[in-house]
């Protein structure tokens, strides 16, 4: 039985940086900030639609979950508790920045039934991270990943982006090598989509940012799928989901509504 997620989107409120590639409200398709009642409503609805809640995680995505105000983070976590304790959902999955992980935060997550933590690494090149205004370093990613794994109660997920400003084939393969060395259970691979209203969009319009060839990115992602399979790492996402909002805001990059299928067709 495969696992599934019930997603609760937490907008840009938790992100301390506006990364060069990010227009989070475009990606999530919403500006609404969810509160406890929203979490309960979404979970209640899911109970009527999901076949096996024991294989379903309540997932807080869309922003940097551990960077939101502490009271708000606890509000959302507490709202989900009854569905785990009483209704036997599998647990809670969150995504966050690597520089917002600490023992204090992990203690809170552990005590509130968080079972999976995904870190937005994006690149394992400090040059690429700085060029794309990420606001953290490779060392931050490595430190956070190791700390998460040391608890023994969290599944580690890592997210990487392909084709960022200042990246190339060599940096992508270096990023993969360093991510694989951290032994995550899951990875998400997002080829860059250049969105209107972002710094990356401005660099693209000016000609300063020249993306890699689309076919080259497909080849790289195809290779990463093969390597992940060899290592037993589950690629749970490859490419942004098909979205009318994304398509309307897209200036360029590596978007296809069936991007994963394109890559799998190369193997």
Model-derived regions: residue spans:
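Canonical Radical SAM [4Fe-4S] cluster-binding loop centered on the CxxxCxxC motif
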Residues: 1-38
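Generic structural hydrophobic/aromatic packing signal, biased to beta-strands
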Residues: 8, 80, 94, 235-238
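Short glycine-enriched loops at secondary-structure junctions
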Residues: 11-14, 190-195, 241
């Amino acid at each position: 039985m495969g696992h599934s997620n019930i997603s609760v989107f937490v907008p840009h409120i938790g992100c301390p940086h506006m990364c060069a590639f990010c227009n989070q409200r475009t990606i999530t398709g919403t500006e609404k900030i969810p509160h406890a009642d929203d979490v309960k409503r979404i979970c209640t609805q899911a109970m009527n639609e999901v076949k096996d809640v024991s294989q379903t995680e309540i997932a807080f995505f869309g922003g940097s979950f551990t960077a939101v105000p502490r009271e708000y983070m606890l509000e959302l976590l507490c709202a989900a508790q009854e569905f785990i304790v009483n209704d036997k959902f599998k647990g809670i999955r969150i995504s966050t920045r690597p520089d917002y992980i600490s023992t204090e935060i992990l203690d809170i997550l552990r005590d509130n039934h968080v079972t999976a933590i995904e870190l937005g690494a994006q690149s394992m090149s400090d040059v690429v991270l700085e060029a794309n205004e990420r606001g953290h370093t490779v060392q931050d990613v490595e430190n956070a990943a190791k700390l998460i794994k040391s608890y023994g109660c969290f599944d580690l997920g890592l997210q990487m982006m392909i084709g960022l400003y200042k990246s190339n084939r060599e940096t992508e393969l270096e990023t993969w090598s360093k991510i694989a060395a951290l032994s995550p259970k899951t990875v998400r691979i997002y080829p860059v989509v250049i969105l209107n209203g972002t710094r990356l969009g401005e660099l693209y319009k000016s000609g300063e940012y020249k993306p890699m060839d689309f076919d080259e990115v497909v080849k790289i992602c195809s290779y990463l799928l093969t390597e992940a399979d060899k290592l037993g790492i589950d690629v749970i996402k490859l490419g942004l989901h098909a979205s009318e909002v994304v398509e309307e805001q897209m200036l360029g990059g590596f978007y296809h509504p069936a991007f994963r299928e394109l890559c799998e067709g190369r193997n």
